[in-house]
Design a protein with these regions (language model features):
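Structural helix-boundary/capping segments
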Residues: 35, 114, 164-252, 266-267, ...
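An N-terminal boundary/leader segment
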Residues: 1-52, 270, 442-444
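Glycine-rich, small-residue loops and helix-cap segments
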Residues: 18, 29, 73, 114, ...
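Short glycine/serine-rich loop/turn segments
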Residues: 71-211, 360-378
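Gly/Ser-rich, acidic/histidine-flanked active-site/gating loops
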Residues: 73, 213, 230-292, 314-317, ...
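Acyltransferase
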Residues: 22-27, 56-59, 259-279, 303-308, ...
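Short helix-loop capping/hinge segments that flank enzyme active sites or metal/cofactor-binding pockets
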Residues: 71-94, 292-343, 347, 368, ...
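Flexible, low-complexity linker/loop segments at domain and module junctions
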Residues: 63-74, 238-246, 353, 357
């Protein structure tokens, strides 16, 4: 079996004990990615110099008897919209290919390195994070490690697929409308969209400032928690899982699931005792508002470059950005009003519950040659509707953890949603699900 053989926490423990050299592990990981990534296209650039530099620092601290950090020696991937010192941040586009290299690391990258993690590679993404599929006209498409003829999801697809393929144990992504949750579900790994504003976006290329959020992917619930603690530079308090009140989202989130997804969500709900059903109002309008805000703010980020470099954009992304620039201000204003209204309704939904459960997607990963899927008895765009269940929740800015449910066949993910700032509750439940055998990352 190729790739990393230990999961995040075990790997870090082995490095801290001196059982494994961080440098040797890094050299092997770099060689493994170079040999195997042709099958999946997760990585756009290897960070050989930075990786070896970080690994040698970790080994030096271990030899000196000092603590190298909770993620000592653990390789991590970085979505190519985070600044890495000495590298050009492309955000998945040729448009930025001639920009000057970053002079310092993004805040989250710096936090990861400070925790002992090894920056191993920049990962593929949809151009400027505008998509759910990691279909990229410039750097190629990322393929799902579980079925290379299928989508890995996006826009953080390279970060998710790289974890699933054991190329790195953890990775950084961003999530505006589902860009962590969708690929985590399709690739069968753990992912977290943090509470909006909780993790720094400094040094990351923006897409939709009103909605942009960042977060980690990992090969285990414990690894995801350790990564999050490193990113926010603080330890989370323990939570009594038995005291958590869990309910299931119904209505919009209870419709249109494939039979395997329906069965998986029903099974998980039963195991959690989530008998209460909560229905959010105006979910379809919330999703529409997310589309409007994304299109308008995304366009605003690119108008200047579109005037001079329009031909360098992926035509599909360029068309969406140009359409967003033409949206009337009254529509944008209404979308933001609905955003605030929907956030209030989300807060009300937690009056009698601590965690809400919902499917992450309608079903399994679509094939590349499958432009449409059936939803509600109609054939609709497969790629645009990957965010059917993730996009409405975007408006509220609440934390959402994606759970890789233990199911036969291709991976399926569930969303666990908590109040803002209560990632501790999400991690407590995630670790219990993993311990109880109800959830597990699917690595190849």
């Amino acid at each position: 079996m190729s790739g990393l053989q230990q999961r995040t926490l075990a790997l870090a423990a082995s490095v801290r004990k001196g059982e494994i050299s961080a440098r040797d592990l890094t050299v092997k990981t770099l060689a493994d990615i170079e040999a195997r990534d042709k099958d999946y296209n997760c990585v756009t650039r290897l960070l050989m110099h930075r990786a070896l530099e970080a690994a040698e620092r970790v080994d030096r601290l271990v030899l000196q008897g000092q603590d190298p950090g909770p993620l000592a020696g653990v390789p991590f991937g970085i979505k190519d919209l985070f600044d890495v010192r000495g590298e050009i941040t492309t955000a998945g586009s040729k448009v930025l290919a001639n920009d000057p290299p970053a002079t310092q690391d993004a805040t989250l990258v710096a936090h990861m390195i400070a925790a002992g993690a090894i920056p191993i590679a920049l990962t593929n993404m949809d151009e400027f994070a505008y998509g759910f599929a990691t279909i990229n006209a410039h750097y190629g498409n990322t393929r799902n490690p579980h079925a290379p003829e299928r989508l890995a999801g996006g826009s953080s697809g390279g970060s998710a697929a790289g974890v699933a393929a054991r190329m790195f144990s953890i990775s950084l992504g961003s999530d505006t409308n589902g860009s962590i949750r969708v690929p985590a579900s399709l690739c069968g790994i753990w992912g977290l969209r943090a509470t909006q504003g909780r993790l720094s976006v400094e040094g990351s290329y923006p897409f939709v400032p009103s909605l942009d959020t960042v977060g980690p992917f990992a090969d285990s619930a414990g690894g995801l928690k350790a990564c999050f603690e490193a990113l926010c530079a603080r330890s989370l308090a323990d939570v009594d899982v038995g005291s958590l009140r869990i309910a299931r989202l119904g209505g919009w989130f209870g419709e249109n699931m494939s039979a395997p997804m329906q069965t998986a969500i029903d099974t998980l709900s039963m195991a959690l005792g989530a008998t209460d059903v909560v229905e959010l109002p105006e979910v379809a309008r919330a999703r529409a508002a997310a589309f409007v805000i994304s299109a308008s703010e995304g366009a605003g980020q690119h108008l200047k470059r579109l005037r001079t470099q329009a031909a360098d954009y992926d035509p599909a992304v360029r068309d969406r950005l140009l359409a967003g620039a033409l949206l009337p201000s009254t529509l944008i204003f209404q979308a933001h009003r609905l955003r605030h209204w929907f956030r209030d309704r989300m807060h009300e939904a937690f009056a009698k519950t601590d965690i809400l459960l919902a499917p992450a997607l309608v079903g399994e990963a679509p094939r590349f040659d499958q432009p449409e899927i059936e939803i509600g008895g109609k054939m609709v765009s497969a790629r645009a509707n990957l965010g059917l269940y993730t996009q409405p929740l975007t408006l509220a800015g609440f934390p959402v953890l994606t759970v890789p449910m233990k199911v036969p066949g291709l991976p399926l993910g569930a969303q666990l949603i908590a109040r803002p700032g209560r990632e501790d509750q999400l991690f407590a439940l995630a670790e219990k699900l993993e311990t109880d055998g109800l959830a597990e990352a699917r690595l190849i």
